[in-house]
Amino acid sequence: SFKQRHKGKHVLQGWPPVPGSGLPAAIGAKVANPERMVIDIDGDGSLNMTIQEMAVCHRYQLGVKIMVINNQWLGMVRQWQDMIYKGHRAASNLTDKLVVGKSVGEQIEESVDVYPDFVKIADGYSVKAERVTSHDLLEDAIKRMLANPNEPYLLDVIVEAEENVFPMIPAGGTYRDIIMNLDELENRIKVMRQDQGSNI
């Protein structure tokens, strides 16, 4: 969980999420508050949409920290496909190899291909970066990311491929319809399938 120490310092985009908006918003927050630590916590699919903005971070030496929650999927799209279409997935996997299948709590081989390789891409933009594949290594990696507040840094955190994101709001719903966890999601799916029969 994420604990906030200062009120009014946690910026969310609201709902529905806008893929690709995390890094540009973080850059804006850093320019407006150069003395503050700014961390973009972004999904791999979302970052892919505006990854070229790392050039802005390097060019202007904006110390934006990018933490990529990398499960090799367009995660929210996959989650909706599982919910609405009984797991029939289309065009939501970001690689043709399902190589990321272990939790961040389990060590995976360093040689496993991760696509795209955000560490190599960051290097191409002259932005320091590293990948974390084990929960045991995460805390030290975060410390390294935060060590120099004036330099941009990317931390690629490999997580379980099937990790779901909560809270979520169902299509056509409002904040009153918010789904907070997997049990609520599974109950909502059952109700939807009963209401709509075999169409979903």
List each model region and its residues.
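Thiamine diphosphate
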Residues: 2-200
